[in-house]
Amino acid sequence: MPTIQQLVRKGRHSKVVKTKAPALKGNPMKRGVCTRVFTTTPKKPNSALRKVARVKLNGGVEVTAYIPGEGHNLQEHSIVLVRGGRVKDLPGVRYKIVRGALDTQGVKGRQQARSRYGAKKEKK
């Protein structure tokens, strides 16, 4: 244990918490413009073609964001809303695009977890 004199000299340092989504700069979401929409393959042992987009955010930072859900209407110059949240099997992808906001359409025919994918309730 330190002496009182040592604490007077140095003091206690609180741990610095590193943010998991630095490009958002503390905001819950940020708007951006798609610069490139493409597919990429996940790490082993998974196998797929994951849909991702390079997005230039309003702060000037360019990030890679995942496009969740089945099918999308995004292309270059689409305006999107980006939130934090990494994709475990895609290295370097720490953001997700919000479905059903701005230029991004919701997932068609989605029955469960509709609010996450911007899907409207289907009429019977």
From Swiss-Prot:
Keyword tRNA-binding: yes
BP-aspect Gene Ontology terms: translation
Record organism: Kocuria rhizophila (strain ATCC 9341 / DSM 348 / NBRC 103217 / DC2201)
Positions of post-translational 3-methylthioaspartic acid modification: D89
Assembly notes: Part of the 30S ribosomal subunit. Contacts proteins S8 and S17. May interact with IF1 in the 30S initiation complex.
A molecular function (GO) term: tRNA binding
Role of this protein: With S4 and S5 plays an important role in translational accuracy.
NCBIfam families given in the database record: rpsL_bact (TIGR00981)
Keyword RNA-binding listed: yes
Protein name per its UniProtKB record: Small ribosomal subunit protein uS12
Family matches, as CDD domains: Ribosomal_S12
Family recorded in the similarity comment: Belongs to the universal ribosomal protein uS12 family.
Region spans: Disordered: 105-124
Gene Ontology cellular-component terms listed: small ribosomal subunit
HAMAP family (alphabetical): Ribosomal_uS12_B
UniProt xrefs under SUPFAM superfamilies: Nucleic acid-binding proteins
InterPro entries according to UniProt: NA-bd_OB-fold, Ribosomal_uS12, Ribosomal_uS12_bac
Domain of life, per lineage: Bacteria
Entry keyword set: Methylation, Ribonucleoprotein, Ribosomal protein, RNA-binding, rRNA-binding, tRNA-binding
Biased amino acid composition, Basic residues: 111-124
